[in-house]
Swiss-Prot record:
GO terms for cellular component: host cell cytoplasm; host cell endomembrane system; membrane; viral envelope; virion membrane. Signal peptide: none annotated. GO terms for biological process: viral budding via host ESCRT complex. The avirulent strain Ni-CE does not block the formation of stress granules. The gene is M. The record marks V95 as: Involved in the inhibition of stress granules formation and contributes therefore to virulence. It is found in: Virion membrane; Host endomembrane system; Host cytoplasm. This is Matrix protein. It is a peripheral membrane protein. Homomultimer. Interacts with nucleoprotein and with the cytoplasmic domain of glycoprotein. Interacts with host ATP6V1A; this interaction plays an important role in virion uncoating after viral entry.
């Protein structure tokens, strides 16, 4: 197991030294470091900056030659550099992408469409999250192309404040979602007031 971790670490170090995010993705897609342990975010009642948001998320994957999550993960590793929206929404967009892509796709022409409709609870640090009553929306298209492959991602996320009781925003499993979150470097920390909760810092 230690040998595997060293191999993965060395591979990750090599990836970070690559000058261009459009370089070819690694062939060993099964090698990845699991992200920090994600645990359910419990119900909070006394938090002034805790708000429930109804989330609509849609991710379209377009590729004439099919696609693999190896390619998607390669694209999303550089998400911080290519994100074009409101920075207060970047953490939420990352989570929605991960959750949406881990669900069941629906064919739509040449596209595969993943949709997420779920009530999520977030806590932002330093008042960086949405303002009271604010609605956030983000749409973006990301493409990856070389001589052999073309993959396009169309992302649309809408967050509206609502008063429905939410459940969790993260899943403590070694799932495809966690792989995507790990690739996108989602910033979290354990709550000082509740050891069973992870807080979103962005």
């Amino acid at each position: 197991m230690n040998i595997l971790r060293k191999i993965v670490k060395n591979r990750k170090d090599e990836d970070t030294q690559k000058p261009s995010p459009a370089s070819a993705p690694p062939d060993d897609d099964d090698l990845w470091l699991p992200p920090p342990e994600y645990v359910p975010l419990k119900e909070f009642t006394s938090k002034k900056n805790m708000r429930n948001f109804c989330i609509n998320g849609e991710v379209k994957v377009c590729s004439p030659n099919g696609y693999s999550f190896r390619i998607l993960r390669h694209i999303l590793r550089s998400f911080d550099e290519i994100y074009s929206g409101n920075h207060r929404m970047i953490g939420l967009v990352k989570v929605v992408i991960g959750l949406a892509l881990s669900g069941a796709p629906v064919p739509e022409g040449m596209n595969w469409v993943y949709k997420l409709r779920r009530t999520l609870i977030f806590q932002w640090a330093d008042s960086r999250g949405p303002l009271e009553g604010e609605e956030l929306e983000h749409s973006q298209e990301i493409t990856w192309d070389d001589d052999t492959e073309f993959v396009g991602l169309q992302i649309r996320v809408i967050a509206r404040q609502c008063h429905i009781q939410g459940r969790i925003w993260c899943i403590n499993t070694n799932s495809r979602t966690c792989q995507l979150w790990s690739d996108m470097s989602l910033k979290t920390q354990m709550s000082e007031e509740d050891k069973d909760s992870s807080l979103l810092l962005e």
